[in-house]
A protein has these predicted regions:
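Conserved AdoMet
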Residues: 1-78
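Short strand->helix junction
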Residues: 46-50, 84, 182
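N-terminal "domain-start" segment that seeds a small globular fold
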Residues: 50-63, 89, 166-180
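Active-site catalytic pocket residues across diverse enzymes, especially alpha/beta-hydrolases
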Residues: 64, 68, 95-99, 127
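Conserved class I S-adenosyl-L-methionine
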Residues: 72-90, 109-111
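Conserved SAM-binding loop of SAM-dependent methyltransferases across substrates and taxa
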Residues: 84-103
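Extended basic-aromatic, gly/pro-enriched interface segments that bind polyanionic ligands
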Residues: 101, 106-183
């Protein structure tokens, strides 16, 4: 399995770099500082979905956020390895739902980082494919409040896309960050 995965990612790297030469020459070029972003983007694994490991969001809603309600204190939240953005958007939805539940204001912002520039661009766009196989939102979240739904026609028929609303987008700032970089 790993051999196939590595082979596929090397092929992806060569495509991303528009490189047709020997892989060893490409790796030497990366070592010299060329194609570093393309290398990172080709080899990162991006696994996420909305409300992944949802007990964290329940804890945020029930134990953390009420302490900041109407306090005037700003809560700055951080989402590392945020991938395509589903988790920071889940955090933002949790803040807004908690405010409504408590009838109080919570001043919150979210910084979301990832090493992969492609997934950060995807996250900033905030447009996601939605299908019946997509993981469902928790019962306490009203997705229709936070997303616009639209149908897009493609070669295989139609697909449903959901677009994050501006209220959520304004709460999140996306940045490139390598968590293993000590500088």
């Amino acid at each position: 399995y790993k051999d196939i995965m590595i082979s596929n990612r090397i092929d992806k790297l060569k495509r991303n770099c528009k490189y047709s030469g020997d892989i060893m020459d490409l790796l030497d070029s990366i070592e010299d500082g060329n194609y570093v972003t393309e290398f990172i983007n080709s080899f990162t694994t991006n696994k996420t979905h909305f409300f992944r490991e949802d007990f964290h969001f329940v804890d945020l809603r029930d134990r953390v956020l009420p302490n900041f309600a109407n306090s005037g204190t700003k809560i700055n939240m951080y989402c590392s390895a945020s991938s395509t953005g589903e988790e920071p958007y889940s955090m933002a939805m949790t803040v807004l739902e908690t405010m409504e539940l408590l009838g109080k204001t919570i001043n919150a912002s979210i910084i979301a980082t990832d090493i992969d520039t492609n997934v950060l661009q995807y996250a900033a766009n905030g447009i996601y494919r939605f299908s019946k196989s997509s993981k469902e939102f928790p019962s306490w979240i009203r997705p229709q409040k936070y997303f616009k739904r639209r149908i897009q026609k493609n070669l295989s028929g139609e697909e449903v896309l959901i677009k994050v609303n501006d209220e959520l987008k304004k709460m999140i700032t996306f940045h490139v960050m390598n968590l293993s970089d000590n500088s």
